[in-house]
Structure formats: C-alpha cells, structure tokens
C-alpha cells in the first residue's frame, strides 16, 4: 500500500508544480501596447510630472490583471504617420491623427470601429465634439475616434525683436515681413504651410470658406496664388520646421513662427518675451483624436487605453503638461487645472477657450480627394525642390569657381617651373 501512495503523492506534486509554473508564466507574460503620438503630447514623468504610460501599466496590473508594457513612439506630422501606417511597415494599437487625416484613413479602411462600451469615460467628451458637431465628416455616429486635444493655429513672435506696434502684428502678413528676413519659421508640412497662405489670401465671399478643402482643376488657380505667396516667403524664411520650433523660439534664434496655441504656452513658460495672436484674416482649427488602426493586434486593450486617457486625473495631467485645449468637460471644470494654467500665462484659459479663441474666423481641414492630394504633393514638391535646386546651383557654381581657380594656380606654377628650367 505504501508504494501506490508514494506514486500518488509524486503525481500530485508534479501536477502542482506544473500548475504553479503555468500560472507564473501567465502572470509574467508581457503584452506590448504600441502607441504612436505626436511629440511632446503626453505627460511623461519628466520634471516631476505624472508618467501616464507607467500609470496605465500599473492600472492594467491592478485592475485588469494584465502585465502590459507600453511601447511609445512619436511622429512630427500627419503625413509621416500616414506613410508608416498605410505602408504596413509598423503595427500600432493606438494612434492620434488629426481630423482630416482620420477622414482619409477611414475612407481607406485603415481604422477600425471603436467599441464605446469599453470607453465609458467618453461621457465626459463635450457635446461640441459629438454627433452632427463631429470634427470631421462621415462619422456622425462617433465610431472611429475619441478626441484627445484641440486648438487653433496662430503666430508666435518675440517681442524683443518684433515690436508690438508693428503694422503686421495681428495679421498673417508678419510671416512675410522682410524686416525679419532670416528670422521667420514656416511649417514643414504641406497642409499647414499652404493653409497659412490660403488664410492670408482671405475669404473673399465672406462665407467662411478659405478654399483649403477643395483642390481640383477648377480651384487650382487659387492654390497657385498660395504657392506664389509661399515662394515669395522663401526669401525671408529661416527654415521649414516642426518640433525644431521649440528650441528656436525659446532661445530667440528665430523671431516669428506659425504654430499651435498650446505649444505657444509651452514656449512662453521658458521665454516670457514671446507673444501670440490669432491672425485676423482667419486660421485653422483642428482636433487630434485617438484611433485604433485596422491592423492593431491588441484592439481591446487599445480601447482600455483610450478610456484611461479620458479619466479625469489622467486627462488633467496631460492637459497641464501639453497646455493644449481639452475636449473633456471634466478637465475644464477642474479647479487645479484652471489654477495651473493661470500660473503658466495669465490669459491661458482665454487663449485656449475664451473670447480670444473665438475672435477670428476659423475653418478645419478636411480630407482632399485623391486628385487633390496628388496636386498638393506636386505643389509642395515644386516649393521644396526649387529650394533644393537653388542650393544645388549655388553649390555647383561654387565648385566650378574653385576648380577654375585651382586650374589657374596649377597652370601658373607649371609655367614658373618650366621658366626656371630654361633659365
């Protein structure tokens, strides 16, 4: 009887060991959530701020029983993000494009519908971003995205270089002012750069349409006028930039730049000589929103992440870090958030949400037709390549001059050497 009992005990011991090992492996299995966002667009734990991604990982362990690792990377333009997603070269679970790009990606089946039952914090999204008020066409049922931040484009200028009584302060004209040649920064993406020129050209009919969303054979002449403006601007532009603008404007190495209101507040915190206005002619309004790509491997977890980002404490942390306008009513009503923003800039809430933000005409970008996108790429290429060709001509001329000079010196030395031989 002892031998069968011993076998039974050994059997139970082995089974128990296997079960414990299996449980341990399950608890230790890491699920990687791939998130693709704009640069400087989340509270990351720097300088004492909340590390939102680390908080989500802790939330997953404690509330969902999952061992999650957030793999977080950034992009600098909608177009670069789109190129990566559409090529299939990388699989992300959460992406945060802008309104017009969301519309394009929906049309191309690059996004999957969201399950709002997994995103209960969606209830805190302001009604201005839902239903018929949705920030891009073709999604009045709010199927494909949840708004993250929104805002408007304005002009940032350094008051130690640009005087407040300057004639062009308040107008897009400041971006073309030759008094600041070599000190002006322009967007390094086609929609925003052409947008500055189209808004500067104005809304002739007074119907609120600046022609920014229609590019076809019929409307091409209007865009060619914008191209002429951008070509004219090249003589005063220091460079075409995106995230590089932060260091340039903070350090004072540039005087004027078109950029987003939230980023102005961030720059102002480090350089209080910077000022800002929304151009009187009109400007772009935009919404960046959280989406799940069609090829996401962890779609359900991605929606938990989106819901987490809409939780009040997390959304407040992100809003206090980025200084962008939040679409969540819970954030705007938060007293700590209001106090934080007033410490950054006395007019911060007005710039983001108040009369200043409502004082000029605005129009949001919508997706261009395939024909329009092709035309835009050609126009942008013409603008940028002309610069490259110009640089190439100068470099080529320089090389030729150096070569001719070297040839002349060589011939002179050769003559002297032969002259010595015959002396």
How should each PLM-predicted stretch be described?
Residues 36-50, 98-250:
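Extracytoplasmic ligand-binding site segments that recognize negatively charged/polar headgroups
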Residues 92-97, 238-239, 255-260, 275-276:
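Paired acidic/hydrophobic, glycine-rich loop segments that form the ligand-binding mouth/hinge
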Residues 353-423:
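Conserved C-terminal helix/tail region of periplasmic/extracytoplasmic solute-binding proteins
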Residues 26-108, 391:
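Early extracytoplasmic/lumenal segment of secretory-pathway proteins
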Residues 101-104, 256-273:
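A ligand-binding cleft/hinge motif common to bilobed small-molecule-binding domains
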Residues 226-231, 270-294:
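Periplasmic-binding protein-like
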Residues 21-22:
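C-terminal motif of bacterial Sec signal peptides marking the signal peptidase cleavage site
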Residues 288, 293-360:
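Mature extracytoplasmic/periplasmic domains
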């Amino acid at each position: 009887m002892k031998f069968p009992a011993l076998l039974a005990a050994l059997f139970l011991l082995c089974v128990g060991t296997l079960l414990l090992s299996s449980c341990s492996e399950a608890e230790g299995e890491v699920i990687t959530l791939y998130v693709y966002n704009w640069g400087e667009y989340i509270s990351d734990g720097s300088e004492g701020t909340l590390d939102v991604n680390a908080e989500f990982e802790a939330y997953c362990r404690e509330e969902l029983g999952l061992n999650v690792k957030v793999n977080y990377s950034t992009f600098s333009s909608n177009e670069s993000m789109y190129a990566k997603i559409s090529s299939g070269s990388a699989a992300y679970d959460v992406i945060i494009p802008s309104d017009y790009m969301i519309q394009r990606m929906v049309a191309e089946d690059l996004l999957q519908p969201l399950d709002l039952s997994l995103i209960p914090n969606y209830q805190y999204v302001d009604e201005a971003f839902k239903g018929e008020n949705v920030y891009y066409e073709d999604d009045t049922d709010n199927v494909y995205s949840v708004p993250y931040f929104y805002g408007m484009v304005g002009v940032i200028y350094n008051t130690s270089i640009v005087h407040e009584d300057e004639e062009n302060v308040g107008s897009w004209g400041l971006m073309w002012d030759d008094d600041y040649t070599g000190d002006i920064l322009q967007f390094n993406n086609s929609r925003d750069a052409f947008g500055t020129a189209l808004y500067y050209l104005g809304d002739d009919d007074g119907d609120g349409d600046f022609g920014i969303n229609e590019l076809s054979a019929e409307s091409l002449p209007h865009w060619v006028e914008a191209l002429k403006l951008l070509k004219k601007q090249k003589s005063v532009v220091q460079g075409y930039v995106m995230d590089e603008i932060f260091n340039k404007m903070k350090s004072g190495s540039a005087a004027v730049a078109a950029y987003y209101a939230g980023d102005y507040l961030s720059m102002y915190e480090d350089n209080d000589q910077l000022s800002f206005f929304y151009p009187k002619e009109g400007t772009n309004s935009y919404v960046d929103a959280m989406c799940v790509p069609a090829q996401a491997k962890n779609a359900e977890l991605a929606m938990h992440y989106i819901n987490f980002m809409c939780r009040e404490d997390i959304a407040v942390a992100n809003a206090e870090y980025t200084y962008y306008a939040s679409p969540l009513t819970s954030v705007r009503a938060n007293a700590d958030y209001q106090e934080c923003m007033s410490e950054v800039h006395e007019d911060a809430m007005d710039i983001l949400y108040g009369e200043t933000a409502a004082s000029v005409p605005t129009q949001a970008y919508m997706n261009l037709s395939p024909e329009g996108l092709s035309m835009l790429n050609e126009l942008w290429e013409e603008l940028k390549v002309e610069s490259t060709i110009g640089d190439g001509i100068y470099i080529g001329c320089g090389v030729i001059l150096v070569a001719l000079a070297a040839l002349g010196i060589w011939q002179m030395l050769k003559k002297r050497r032969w002259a010595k031989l015959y002396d």
